[in-house]
Regions:
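Flexible, polar/acidic helix-loop-strand segments at domain edges
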Residues: 2, 82-179
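Second-shell loop/turn segments in exported
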Residues: 1, 40-48, 63-68, 131, ...
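Solvent-exposed, polar/charged alpha-helical surfaces in well-ordered, non-transmembrane soluble domains
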Residues: 40, 44, 52, 56-60, ...
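Solvent-exposed coil/turn segments that connect beta secondary-structure elements
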Residues: 14-17, 26-31, 47, 74-77, ...
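C-terminal solvent-exposed extensions
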Residues: 34, 38, 136, 174, ...
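Entry/capping segment at the start of metal-dependent catalytic domains
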Residues: 1-19, 202-207
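Secretory-pathway/luminal and periplasmic proteins that interact with or process carbohydrate-rich
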Residues: 79, 89-90, 192-197
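Extracytoplasmic
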Residues: 4-9, 18-26, 37-39, 53, ...
Length: 209
């Protein structure tokens, strides 16, 4: 693993009996015991000891029993989104502006291209109001997930991340197994996980319903 703070933490619960998938975000700036009674921002646990340390932190502080993990970088998310044909997402003027800014760095980090979205004119009085639905490619949708400077701050940021993951699950449900297998082949090398490919294959019926 890379000795850097984690950007995002999402706890995912998969119920194989009810076919239900639930997601809960942990704010990365939450003050938690990250180990040895050291209290600091939760995202530091990953830098201190990788995914295992992050899991220990969550289990210790939140009384959970997490045993498995998957970590991925921006490149993996971009790849999945592009493999599924992009996402149609309603955006506000503020989100378009911030997303375009993040796209510059996301494109450099992943080596993938994008086209900046044109901001509507004139600038609306309420910049947080939805101005339209836009088709986003991997770089754009990943940059959308990174936005944290709108009025909703980190709460809005984590909500966007869960929204994108939910939309990806929905698209995967209608993509077909051949597309899902292609995504696995493309993305698995970019992911560090405690799960084997066989484990993930066993989750597919639940994840795609």
């Amino acid at each position: 693993y890379s000795a850097q703070n984690s950007d995002t933490m999402i706890i995912v619960s998969v119920n194989n009996d009810t076919k239900e998938v639930r997601m809960v975000s942990v704010y990365r700036d939450t003050l938690l015991n990250v180990g040895d009674d050291t209290y600091t921002k939760a995202n530091a646990a990953y830098a201190l000891g990788g995914p295992e340390q992050a899991i220990t932190m969550l289990n210790t502080n939140l009384d959970l029993d997490i045993s498995d993990y998957a970590t991925a970088d921006f490149s993996a998310l971009v790849e999945v989104i592009d493999d599924l044909g992009g996402l149609d997402i309603p955006l506000s003027y503020a989100e378009i502006e911030h997303m375009n800014n993040y796209c510059v760095e996301t494109s450099k980090l992943t080596g993938k291209d994008y086209t900046p979205l044109e901001k509507p004119e004139p600038k609306p009085e309420d910049q947080e109001a939805i101005v339209g639905t836009y088709h986003l490619n991997g770089v754009q949708a990943t940059s959308y997930c990174r936005i944290r400077y709108t009025a909703s701050l980190d709460m809005g940021r984590t909500e966007r991340q869960r929204r994108v993951l939910g939309m990806l699950f929905d698209k995967a449900k209608i993509a077909g197994l051949s597309s899902i297998f292609k995504i696995m082949d493309d993305v698995f090398p970019m992911v560090t996980t405690s799960l084997s490919k066989q484990d993930i294959l066993g989750l597919i019926p639940t994840l795609i319903g």
